[in-house]
A protein has these predicted regions:
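N-terminal core-binding DNA-recognition domain of tyrosine recombinases/integrases
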Residues: 10-21, 27-90
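Catalytic cores of transferase enzymes with a strong primary signal for eukaryotic protein kinases
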Residues: 7
Length: 90
């Protein structure tokens, strides 16, 4: 059964002892992933999917006049990296 990023992230958040603020940041990234809507199951994710998502996050932050769109995209990248690395080890 293909695993989605949301399923993997929920399991990751349950497995790790993270602060409430950190959990909320991860959930924010998941909401962005869902809004983006072009994700594939983890087993079929390619570099281009991640790159397109991060570009979308950056462009959205610029359009929303965010104070630091680069930081926003970097945080999303860090969250994806942590969840995907953890999921691939499971």
């Amino acid at each position: 059964m293909p695993r989605t990023l949301r399923t993997a992230a929920e399991r990751y958040l349950r497995a790790k002892a993270l602060s409430r603020g950190t959990r909320n940041e991860y959930r924010s990234t998941l909401r962005k992933w869902d809004q983006w809507g072009h994700g594939a199951p983890i087993e079929k994710l390619q570099r281009r999917h991640v790159r397109e998502f991060l570009d979308w996050v950056y462009e959205r932050a610029v359009a929303d006049h965010g104070t630091s769109p680069g930081r926003t995209a970097n945080k999303a990248r860090e969250h994806l990296r942590a969840v995907l690395s953890w999921a691939w080890e499971q």
